[in-house]
């Protein structure tokens, strides 16, 4: 299974449900499998509150595999020989995307307790900006457990395609 980890940096504002904004943000994400030419084989995986973008596979220096490794991979339920699977780290998470320990561009200091409160729709909005940048306009499925399931529901309501 082909695994790639990448980071996308966004310089635009992300307007949040709370009325606050992030003045730019970063999203780290992993992909599994190969995106086909017309980008019609995408499956989006959304992680739980304590999860990360590392949903499957194992790196040489890791003791355990990604949190859904039993389900994602060549010949598995989410078959990476057929589908291009993408799992982005939620903004606000401590696993590489913009979070309370990130630098606030307006103060040049870590956000810490000044990091804005996020709604599920804020996380989805940030992810949609990532998919737009990658040229992905729809997905075969959006799947997630626990908080990831809440994100999947938000996609179904706010972005049904």
How would you name each of these model-derived features?
Residues 1-42:
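Catalytic-loop region of hydrolases
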Residues 30, 34, 40-102:
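N-terminal cap/lid subdomain of alpha/beta-hydrolase-fold enzymes
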Residues 44-45, 87, 141-143, 154:
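A structural signal for short, well-ordered beta-strand segments and their strand-loop junctions
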Residues 67-72, 112-118:
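A short acidic, glycine-rich active-site loop
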Residues 97-117:
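Short acidic, low-complexity segments enriched in Ser/Thr/Gly/Pro
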Residues 108-114, 121-141, 158-160:
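Conserved acidic catalytic loop of the alpha/beta-hydrolase fold
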Residues 146:
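Catalytic nucleophile serine of serine hydrolases
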Residues 149-160:
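Short glycine-enriched nucleophile-adjacent loop
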